[in-house]
A protein has these predicted regions:
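A conserved amphipathic helix/loop scaffold
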Residues: 2-190
């Protein structure tokens, strides 16, 4: 995030109303590819007002977490845990070592007119759906899940409208578009 003032540009975009879904492996290395000596994240901790506590390799066998509505959420591959404004906590650790119980694993923080949704683990399935639905709702985007690992969002700009499809699990997938959607052109490949 240090190159070409990207961090500053993202922060300005969020303050102006953007919704940034970030983590868990974002902003952990400097522009030389080295870890920061004095903090885990480069600018995220100061920007959203949190203190990173732990980074733990975890596959959900030793640590359990729950969303604020008490439904279970998965802990997949890695767990970054932090403390900060508890109003921003979306999900927290509920079982594991006493030092980590109650720590935030997913959080959402209001910055200016926008929001930062910080992921402490790699969301899958229903957890990814929940995060995408939340982010799209705050961004004013209609969200639809096309398949288990594909999201679909309709977008309308000044000169054109379209659909953004994103595969987020590295598995490939298919999305069948309705005939009502009309003729479409892939803007990347033509």
């Amino acid at each position: 995030l240090e190159e070409k003032q990207l961090s500053n540009r993202i922060q300005e975009w969020v303050r102006d109303g953007g919704v940034w879904v970030v983590g868990p492996f974002t902003d952990i290395r400097n522009q030389n590819g080295a870890k920061y000596k004095d903090r885990h994240f480069g600018t995220l901790e100061d920007f959203i007002g949190i203190d990173w506590l732990y980074g733990i390799p975890e596959n959900g066998k030793l640590m359990k977490a729950e969303w604020n509505d008490h439904t279970l959420c998965s802990v997949n591959t890695w767990a970054d845990l932090w403390k900060g404004n508890s109003d921003g906590t979306l999900a927290q650790v509920t079982a594991g070592h006493q030092a980590i119980n109650g720590q935030t694993i997913y959080g959402m923080y209001c910055i200016g007119k926008g929001k930062v949704i910080l992921l402490g683990t790699l969301p899958v399935g229903e957890d990814m759906d929940r995060i995408l639905s939340l982010a799209c709702r705050y961004a004013g985007i209609t969200y639809k899940r096309a398949e288990k690992n594909i999201m679909l969002a309709r977008r309308k700009g000044t000169n054109r409208e379209g659909i953004i499809l994103a595969e987020y699990a590295g598995k490939g997938g298919v999305c069948h578009l309705d005939k009502a959607d009309g003729r479409m052109t892939d803007i990347l490949s033509g």
